[in-house]
Amino acid sequence: MLRVALAKGRLLKSFIEYLQQVNQIDIATVLLNRQRQLLLTVDNIEMILVKGSDVPTYVEQGIADVGIVGSDILNGQKYNINKLLDLPFGKCHFALAAKPETSCYKKVATSYVHTATQFFNKEGMDVEVIHLNGSVELSCVVDMVDAIVDIVQTGSTLTANGLVEKKYISEINAKLITNKESYFKQSSEIERLIKQLGVSISYA
């Protein structure tokens, strides 16, 4: 039995859509019908649904053999895992966003302090970065900050709140990661999963 840790939320929705595209209907159906279950089994695969930022920890600790997680999570911290594959779904990007008339960014809110700080340092910008856990758009709408750094997929949330993308920061995509010990002990099961996903190994 191969245990796979999946990130709940946006990435899970994208993963289910991809499974349907590659005709892995059984797995997609189980995930769609999960209700509030956090542990699901299908085709010799046990799936655990966890917060995105926790996926690498479950894999690193050996609780899960494999994980599917956004590259943004992996960039924020070092983990003792194999970053095995780039996956062809879950694509979006980090961006700096603000009101259309704003051109000076002294105070910026984000849930992704590491990414934002790296970006502003690289750009040579002196910015105060404020950490928020969610609804970062609101902080800009009510003028608590000049701008936000957030994940953008379609841009509809920005538009709905009267904000526009000012600067592209970096791309995000889904990655398949493995526990280092499981990579050898369950190599055949991992290879089977990779074939089911219709992708090939290219070390990242």
UniProtKB/Swiss-Prot annotation:
Protein name listed in UniProt: ATP phosphoribosyltransferase
Function: Catalyzes the condensation of ATP and 5-phosphoribose 1-diphosphate to form N'-(5'-phosphoribosyl)-ATP (PR-ATP). Has a crucial role in the pathway because the rate of histidine biosynthesis seems to be controlled primarily by regulation of HisG enzymatic activity.
Gene3D superfamilies to which the protein is assigned, alphabetical: Periplasmic binding protein-like II
GO biological process: L-histidine biosynthetic process
Originating species: Staphylococcus epidermidis (strain ATCC 12228 / FDA PCI 1200)
EC class of the enzyme, as a word: transferase
Domain notes from UniProt: Lacks the C-terminal regulatory region which is replaced by HisZ.
Primary gene name: hisG
Lineage top rank: taxon: Bacteria
Disulphide bonds in the chain: none
